[in-house]
Amino acid sequence: LPFNPLTKLEYAKDKGQIPNAVYQLIIKRFHIVADGISRIEKASGLDYPSYYVEPSLVITTSKVEDGQFGIFFARTVPIIGEDNHLNFVVQLTAPLIAYGLVGSIHAILAHELMHYLSLISRVLKMNVISEEIPESLFEEKYRDFEHLLEARVIFKHDRSLINHIDKKFPEGFTDPRMEEKVLEHWMNKHLPTTILPIDANIVRIPIELMAKLQVDQVIREKIIQFENTKVRSKKSSDYV
């Protein structure tokens, strides 16, 4: 699914939705994303899925936690392509690239590959996702963690990357420095913000579309390999 990952960002800048200074900052730091993807591909032996930069801050709220919100710095979402075929694309938010440290950006990129592989695995097994809608952000974090493949299996050739994931995802993504910068330089300046309901990060796919997911044989074989590899303990938790 070839496309320019910066198209939506460029459109937002041209429409005056994103200040030129912020746009230039993201462009200047975009090499961190490119470097991270190359690193992840080398460590996993897989091509990274299609991705794009979402020119907004994406936050989520729940009905039972008044005044509280969580930030989605990245998401892996299903898309319907040509001939009604199912695919997945990674959405990276502009604030992540603008204000994230290298370790945080690389950890999140790696985490989204873990999401991508887990979603493909579940679709291939025709595992219809019809779970209960989580009632709180806390429940959503741990629900997300339940389904992911092991980072130490997927990225076993890059111990430093695994350490980044373990550090940034102790029990859900945490980076107070980046979160403060995002609030100060993005949210408080009223730059584009998208508010999603808490269940927006639950992927629901009709079974007829599952049958139309085209998966490269290399990915199929890698998923089987990852799933059959045992590790001593599960340390890294996973949520963006």
Predicted regions: what they are:
Residues 103, 123, 127-240:
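Metalloprotease/metallohydrolase-associated module, dominated by Zn2+-dependent proteases
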Residues 6-21:
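Acidic/histidine-rich, surface-exposed loop or edge segments in extracytoplasmic proteins
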